[in-house]
């Protein structure tokens, strides 16, 4: 067999994918390393983690070697089938591997190639480890040791080594052909030096020596080819393996590994000045501060913190990664920043969260020609110059999940913005702080933004040398929106809004009658309360129910309708859980709320008198708080904090409050002493204990880490019967029927839809249907409901409830999940 035939036959993936030949995938992966090397050279001064030429050469070598384990009988047969002419040729060559009934994963077989193509110093050990873990396998959690790997796969390794020994002359020429093909295609000094070093290292006598050691149970096998496994978490291996993974994945997807250019921030001062008008405080403050690398910005809700974050990122000339906890709010910011009069062009900014593709579909519907696959892939690989994302995508790397290195490798060239830090409870705060410590370790840039900095965060941020800037201290700060505006007059009602039997206080109806010409927001502490309260008013078209366990489509429609109507109409009432706090930019006239912790209270108040130019000068209260706790509230909030909150609220009952007074209330609550310690100290100790536990914590996959992090850990459940009841689209209805009928492959589903309807659709359009007609089911429903008896299957990460009664579908659409199950006690409130 001619050697060119071999290099032109061996595949890396099926032939319906781009660059399916192994030589082309390796070339494209090396090209990404070369591109990243050039990007690094251009932006060297902006990187806080320095990468030398020797390290880049090692990365290029690893990218050539990483998939050589795909030279395997079983792998190639699976890709090619039995009847192709190419397979007939290749089958003969790979026949020594035929006795392998089940081959090890290709990245494990690639380790054999690394034993005679790489050296054995510390850098080689890092690259060998990165090769082993460029896909998930058991060695992510287990010891990475050559002896352990060999004796786990002893028979397979002996067969594979014998294959290499038998075919060594052919394989020597094959490797030389691969090296020539790659370096001639790319014509790069880095690639040439990497290829030359592989040639220098290449020693086909080593497989014979290794096989001999295996047969003799030699004690020094582990030293034959070292792995990198430091006693403590190492930023070095995480960054380098992350770069290799990004190169591999972006090569497979056909997207660039890095898209940043300083042009992304061109004329940003002028754009912000034009949009805001006058002399924006953000530009003044940036001029005075010089943009410290680690900073906390404390500024009122609605004052323009997002604009400041863009200026801060521009000052440092790094990619802009902005995180916000709630998807709905993030979607709004994405559309605002990417709009025709926004700050970024369409190809400069991406969005990444579990339903982000829906935002791209909206863009496509507007005729903007978005390439969904490329946009989503580049966002996932952190290639975008500007990225909006939820924290569970980029700020949970301290949970040590597989693939976290891909995110960590971006930290040294990113300006990370963490907005709404006050929304995290102590456990989530610990994860965030631990991750910030990791970003700090690689000297990354971090901007924390908040309207109300929780006092218990301060000591952890101080330890990382964050500079705290309170806009109230800026000279001439009087023009900052909502800073000095007197916005809120609280009134306390010393009884619970609900009793333990979920009966509503008689005073609520009277308050609503007296304020019938106002837009009223009622915030309660759990979903069941919201549903029970809404039942009393559900015939009124001006009353809306909002919470997290509605169908996604219904929730989005209601939020959009409330936003639109509230601009011109009065007399609307929204009954909500605190999902409203950070997700919906709506200005209400009056809030009625249950007692909660002081920081949560003031967060809620931010929806009242939000977008006004003048002080609130009515003598009537616009914040009404039912201050007693019922049993359900006690399940959610710490009694110590509620008692302290209640005491502080009593001091300010009936007073008109501005932003500064409200912040001082938070400080007062957390200075309250309980058993010799302040609340602030109690929270700090709880966070420290959790951080300490994280030192020994690892989860296997990112989805597991996200589930641990999210305030509401749960399952997404698709409801096909809701599609059949409410959708008028024949394509959507056919899709629902197919899922009910147990179709599970996109290829089959798309083909069947076209056959039945005569119309073509895309996977992305059907994914949109999945999300819109899904509901979030908390994990505690698993044990306290008939969750599993309703579940008829799974599809693409969703559980499927394939047989629901019409009455249940109606209840789900109008009231949400809890109306079907009834009340299930939990501390979850959204």
From Swiss-Prot:
GO process terms (BP): defense response to virus
Binding sites annotated in the UniProt record for Mg(2+): 67, 135
Keywords of this entry: Antiviral defense, ATP-binding, Helicase, Hydrolase, Magnesium, Metal-binding, Nuclease, Nucleotide-binding
UniProt-listed InterPro entries: Cas3-like_dom (IPR054712), CRISPR-assoc_Cas3_HD (IPR006483), CRISPR-assoc_Cas3_HD_sf (IPR038257), DEAD/DEAH_box_helicase_dom (IPR011545), Helicase_ATP-bd (IPR014001), Helicase_Cas3_CRISPR-ass_core (IPR006474), P-loop_NTPase (IPR027417)
Molecular function via GO: ATP binding; catalytic activity, acting on DNA; helicase activity; metal ion binding; nuclease activity; nucleic acid binding
Gene3D superfamilies registered for this protein in UniProt: 1.10.3210.30, P-loop containing nucleotide triphosphate hydrolases
Residue ranges that the Swiss-Prot or TrEMBL entry lists as coiled coil: none
Record-linked SMART domains: DEXDc
Cofactor: Mg(2+); Mn(2+)
Entry keyword annotation includes Hydrolase: yes
KW Disulfide bond (keyword) present: no
Superkingdom of source: Archaea
Class of this enzyme: hydrolase
Domain named Helicase ATP-binding: residues: 286-471
EC number: 3.1.-.-, 3.6.4.-
Residues in HD Cas3-type domain copies: 15-250
One Pfam assignment: Cas3_HD
Helicase C-terminal domain mapped to chain residues: 503-660
Residues the entry annotates as binding ATP: 299-306
Swiss-Prot/TrEMBL domain comment: Proteins of this family have an N-terminal nuclease domain and a C-terminal helicase/ATPase domain. In some CRISPR/Cas systems the domains are swapped, in others they are encoded separately.
Family, per entry: In the N-terminal section; belongs to the CRISPR-associated nuclease Cas3-HD family. In the central section; belongs to the CRISPR-associated helicase Cas3 family.
Role this protein plays: CRISPR (clustered regularly interspaced short palindromic repeat), is an adaptive immune system that provides protection against mobile genetic elements (viruses, transposable elements and conjugative plasmids). CRISPR clusters contain sequences complementary to antecedent mobile elements and target invading nucleic acids. CRISPR clusters are transcribed and processed into CRISPR RNA (crRNA). Cas3 plus Cascade participate in CRISPR interference, the third stage of CRISPR immunity. Anneals and unwinds R-loops (in which crRNA binds the target DNA, displacing the noncomplementary strand).
Name assigned to this protein: CRISPR-associated nuclease/helicase Cas3
Organism of origin: Methanothermobacter thermautotrophicus (strain ATCC 29096 / DSM 1053 / JCM 10044 / NBRC 100330 / Delta H) (Methanobacterium thermoautotrophicum)
Gene field: cas3
């Amino acid at each position: 067999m001619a050697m060119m035939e071999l290099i032109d036959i061996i595949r890396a993936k099926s032939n319906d994918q781009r660059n399916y030949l192994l030589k082309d995938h390796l070339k494209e992966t090396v090209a990404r390393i070369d591109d990243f090397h050039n990007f690094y050279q251009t932006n060297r001064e902006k990187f806080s983690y320095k990468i030398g030429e020797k390290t880049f050469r090692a990365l290029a070598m690893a990218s050539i070697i990483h998939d050589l384990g795909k030279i395997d009988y079983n792998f190639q047969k699976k890709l090619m089938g039995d009847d192709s002419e190419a397979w007939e040729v290749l089958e003969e060559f790979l026949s020594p591997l035929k006795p392998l009934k089940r081959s090890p994963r290709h990245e494990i077989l690639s380790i054999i190639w690394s034993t005679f193509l790489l050296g054995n110093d510390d850098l080689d050990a890092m690259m060998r480890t990165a090769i082993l873990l460029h896909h998930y396998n058991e060695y992510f959690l287990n010891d990475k040791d050559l002896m352990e790997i060999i004796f786990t796969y002893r028979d397979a390794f002996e067969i594979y080594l014998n294959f290499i020994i038998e075919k060594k002359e052919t394989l020597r020429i094959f490797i030389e052909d691969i090296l020539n093909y790659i370096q001639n295609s790319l014509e790069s000094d880095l690639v040439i030096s990497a290829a030359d070093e592989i040639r220098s290292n290449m020693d086909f006598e080593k497989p014979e020596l290794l096989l001999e050691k295996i047969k003799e149970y030699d004690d020094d096998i582990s030293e034959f080819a070292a792995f990198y496994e430091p006693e403590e978490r190492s930023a070095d291996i995480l960054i380098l393996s992350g770069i290799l993974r990004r190169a591999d994945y972006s090569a497979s997807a056909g997207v660039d590994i890095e898209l940043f250019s300083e042009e992304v921030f061109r004329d940003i001062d002028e754009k912000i000045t034009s949009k805001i008008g006058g002399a924006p405080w953000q530009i003044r403050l940036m001029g005075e501060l010089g943009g410290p690398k680690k900073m906390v910005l404390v500024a009122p809700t609605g004052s323009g913190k997002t604009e400041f974050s863009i200026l801060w990122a521009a000052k440092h000339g790094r990619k802009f990664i902005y995180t916000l906890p709630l998807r709905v709010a993030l979607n709004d910011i994405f559309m605002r920043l990417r709009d025709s009069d926004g700050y970024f062009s369409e190809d400069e900014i991406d969005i990444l969260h579990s339903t982000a593709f829906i935002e791209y579909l909206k863009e496509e519907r507007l005729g903007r020609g978005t390439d969904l696959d490329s946009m989503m892939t580049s966002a996932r690989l952190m290639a975008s110059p500007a990225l909006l994302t939820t924290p569970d995508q980029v700020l949970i790397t301290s949970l040590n999940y597989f693939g976290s290195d891909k995110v960590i490798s971006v930290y040294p060239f990113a300006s990370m913005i963490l907005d709404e830090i006050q929304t995290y409870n102590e456990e989530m705060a610990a994860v965030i702080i631990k991750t910030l410590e990791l970003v700090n370790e690689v000297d990354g840039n971090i901007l924390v933004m908040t309207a109300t900095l929780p006092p218990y965060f301060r000591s952890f941020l101080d330890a990382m040398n964050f500079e705290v800037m309170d806009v109230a201290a800026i000279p001439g700060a009087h023009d900052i929106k909502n800073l000095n505006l007197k916005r809120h007059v609280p009134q306390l009602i010393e009884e619970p809004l609900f009793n333990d039997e979920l009966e509503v206080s008689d005073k609520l109806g009277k308050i609503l009658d007296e304020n019938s010409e106002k837009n009223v927001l009622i915030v309660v502490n759990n979903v069941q309360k919201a549903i029970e309260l809404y039942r009393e008013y559900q015939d009124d078209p001006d009353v809306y129910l909002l919470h997290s366990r509605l169908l996604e489509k219904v929730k989005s429609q209601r939020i959009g309708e409330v936003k639109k109507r509230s601009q011109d109409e009065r007399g609307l009432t929204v009954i909500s859980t605190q999902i409203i706090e950070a997700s919906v930019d709506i200005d209400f006239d009056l809030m009625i709320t249950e007692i909660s912790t002081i920081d949560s209270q003031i967060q809620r108040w931010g929806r009242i008198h939000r977008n006004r130019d003048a002080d609130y000068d009515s003598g009537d209260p616009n914040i009404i708080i039912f201050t007693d706790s019922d049993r359900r509230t006690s399940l959610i909030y710490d009694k110590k904090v509620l008692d302290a909150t209640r005491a502080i609220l009593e001091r300010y009952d009936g007073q008109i409050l501005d932003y500064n007074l409200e912040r001082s209330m938070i400080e007062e609550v957390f200075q309250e002493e309980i058993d010799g310690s302040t609340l602030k100290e109690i929270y700090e100790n709880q966070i420290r204990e959790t951080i300490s536990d994280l030192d020994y914590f690892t989860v296997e996959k990112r989805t597991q880490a996200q589930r641990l992090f999210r305030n509401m850990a749960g399952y997404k459940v698709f409801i096909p019967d809701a599609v059949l009841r409410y959708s008028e689209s024949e394509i959507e209805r056919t899709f629902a029927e197919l899922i009910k009928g147990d179709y599970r492959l996109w290829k089959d589903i798309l083909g069947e839809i076209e056959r039945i309807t005569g119309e073509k659709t895309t996977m992305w359009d059907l994914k949109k249907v999945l999300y819109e007609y899904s509901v979030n089911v908390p994990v505690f429903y698993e044990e306290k409901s008939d969750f599993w008896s309703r579940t008829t299957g799974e599809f693409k990460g969703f559980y499927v409830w394939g047989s629901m009664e019409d009455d249940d579908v109606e209840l789900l659409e109008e009231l949400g999940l809890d109306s079907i199950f009834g009340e299930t006690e939990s501390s979850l409130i959204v």
